[in-house]
Amino acid sequence: MALLLSYPRRHPSIHLLILSAYALFLLPILDGLELGGDGLYREILRDETVLRLKELGKISDGEGYLERTFLSPASIRASAVIISWMKDAGLTTWIDQMGNIHGRFEPTNSTKEALLIGSHMDTVIDAGMYDGALGIISAISALKVLKVTGRLQRLTRPVEVIAFSDEEGVRFQTTFLGSAAVAGTLPESILQVSDKSGTTVQDVLKLNSLEGTANALGEVRYSPESVGSYVEVHIEQGPVLEALRYPLGVVKGIAGQTRLKVIINGSQGHAGTVPMKLRRDPMVAAAELVLTLETLCKEPNKFLTYDEECGCFTEESLAGLVCTVGELLTWPSASNVIPGQVNFTVDIRAMDDKVRETIVTSFSRLVLQRCDDRLVDCAVEQKHAAAATPCDAELTSRLERATRSTISSMAAGVRRAGGETPVLMSGAGHDAMAMARLTKVGMLFVRCRGGVSHSPEESVMDDDVWAAGLALVNFIDQNAVDAAAATAAES
């Protein structure tokens, strides 16, 4: 009414017309903004999702930085919050024997296989707030939209959101604990793997009131017959979408990955009394090997004989090869002591499994050669290996259609004029790799600023968060909602 009072005095009938126009046009617009009547559900898919991302990002074991590892105190607090959000979306919730959080809607009398949507709740050390969390919260928000619009009850197949307890592998140096357990590929021996403090996986499970037995581990496994597909939303962790000025992209496959641990033992001694020529210094050997790895992965043709080693290397197969030394530890780690032992990690990734396997073999051979030259003892342990994972073509096509529908319906500021939805390869490992052993998988990437990830500088625009959630709503609508019932209800 304040707006009407500012107008010149008019005949009462004019005021009635204005009020009628207000009621007919302005109120539905306001209602649409509040309840999603515009079909875009901004308040749930953008505003509430971003607030929840920030809330989860504050739950940390670190002081002043984000760290949330497998079943840590912060992980337990985060689980309680995620469960409350799942219940808010109308889902039935539970925690399995590997600490994964599940939220599921089960249609009455449905015999169809479930659609699983998930990502991981753990983080690296000094992490950003989007890696993993975005996939979980976007999925919960999408199902909340279905709940508030009455479409949740029209689902024709079960839809389940899973927040996996561990993907990064920070605490136990073994990735995909959560998703591999669900896929049924986690060996019983994992229970005896220990962290840096000597605490085993079994110890941690029992400390958190879980059984920590082989039988309990088997209970986590889903049967392939009960699952139709798995979909994961994740930040790109690369710069391609930003360069293309596009908020979303579909993933055609995930690079294979191998993690190694190199252990070098030399002669510990006094930094001032042992002559240089008489030293057996593992630090120098480690430094040389780090540079050797860099050269091997930058210029593999200098080390590999194509015909003998593989017979299949091409410019394309070698293009996605990347190698990283991310951790180096020395003992006793004192400034005036020649180290007695140096350990470092190696991460090797490639789109072509033959390339990756050959690089692993070649580097392991070079480690032994360099250590012999330096008169130090060494060993190479393989800690993790995962084959490249292709995404299901039909699932990818459906995600692409949902993405295209999303982008065309959003505001002009979110769209890039023309062009098709980008199709990307992922150089990073994801829970979808483990879940591919259970069912067909698909992935949706979300643009992140500068391609930065595993860093507090990780950043995603609010509207891109919105786009990801809306794409999931559209995907679920197209693949799990009774279209005939939905049309009848809306009419």
UniProtKB/Swiss-Prot annotation:
Gene Ontology CC, one term: endoplasmic reticulum
Glycan-linked positions: 109, 265, 343
UniProtKB keywords: Endoplasmic reticulum, Glycoprotein, Hydrolase, Manganese, Metal-binding, Purine metabolism, Signal
Alphabetical list of InterPro entries matching this protein: Amidase_Cbmase (IPR010158), ArgE/DapE_CS (IPR001261), Bact_exopeptidase_dim_dom (IPR036264), Peptidase_M20 (IPR002933), Peptidase_M20_dimer (IPR011650)
Reaction(s) this enzyme catalyzes, per UniProt: allantoate + H2O + 2 H(+) = (S)-2-ureidoglycine + NH4(+) + CO2
Known cofactor(s): Mn(2+)
One GO-annotated biological process of the protein: ureide catabolic process
Keyword match Glycoprotein: yes
Predominant place of localization: endoplasmic reticulum
Signal peptide (residue range): 1-32
Residues engaged in binding Mn(2+) 1: 120, 131, 234
UniProt subunit comment: Homodimer.
UniProt record similarity statement: Belongs to the peptidase M20A family.
NCBIfam families xrefs: hydantase (TIGR01879)
Protein name, as recorded: Probable allantoate deiminase
Organism: Oryza sativa subsp. japonica
